[in-house]
């Protein structure tokens, strides 16, 4: 398990863009983390005030950060950054609303040099909310 301090050591993101609250499981190529979604998230001010829904792109960013924690926690990547290089097969299946706990899983399926490909999914109460294939570039 990695707490918020460990997450902040791995990721350069800070409020309001730090979207990983805790890491529950870590293995060589897979990580499981959570994001507790509250009404205080800044994006709810405009998306949508009368019916707050977490934007899909923010869910994908949370998944990317989850993968980033795993990759940037490795000694050889300390101090580096992870940049989006692409997203494929992204699907949104369930709305994420205040009070939900997003359980995010990212599994690295391919690495070549500084490029990595991740299969990622986000679930709420065991139900798929979003999924996709994310491609990253690791840089200084």
From Swiss-Prot:
Any idea which GO molecular function terms this record carries? (3R)-hydroxyacyl-[acyl-carrier-protein] dehydratase activity
Record-listed E.C. numbers: 4.2.1.59
Predominant location category: cytoplasm
Q: Where is the active site?
A: 47
> What's an example GO BP annotation here?
fatty acid biosynthetic process
The UniProt entry, under Pfam families, shows:
FabA
Where is this protein found? Cytoplasm
What this protein is reported to do is described as: Involved in unsaturated fatty acids biosynthesis. Catalyzes the dehydration of short chain beta-hydroxyacyl-ACPs and long chain saturated and unsaturated beta-hydroxyacyl-ACPs.
Listed name of the protein: 3-hydroxyacyl-[acyl-carrier-protein] dehydratase FabZ
Q: Which organism is it from?
A: Streptococcus pneumoniae serotype 4 (strain ATCC BAA-334 / TIGR4)
Lineage start? Bacteria, Bacillati, Bacillota, Bacilli, Lactobacillales
């Amino acid at each position: 398990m990695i707490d918020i301090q460990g997450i902040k050591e791995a990721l350069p993101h800070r409020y309001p863009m730090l979207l990983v609250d805790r890491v529950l499981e870590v293995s060589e190529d897979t990580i499981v983390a959570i994001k507790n979604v509250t009404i205080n998230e800044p994006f709810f001010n405009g998306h949508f005030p009368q019916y707050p829904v977490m934007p899909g792109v923010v869910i994908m960013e949370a998944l990317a950060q989850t993968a980033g924690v795993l990759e940037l926690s490795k000694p050889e990547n300390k101090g580096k950054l992870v940049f989006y290089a692409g997203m494929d097969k992204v699907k949104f299946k369930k709305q994420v609303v205040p009070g939900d706990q997003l359980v995010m899983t990212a599994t690295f399926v391919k690495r070549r040099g500084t490029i990595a490909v991740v299969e990622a999914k986000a679930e709420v109460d065991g139900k798929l909310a979003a999924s996709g294939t994310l491609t990253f570039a690791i840089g200084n």
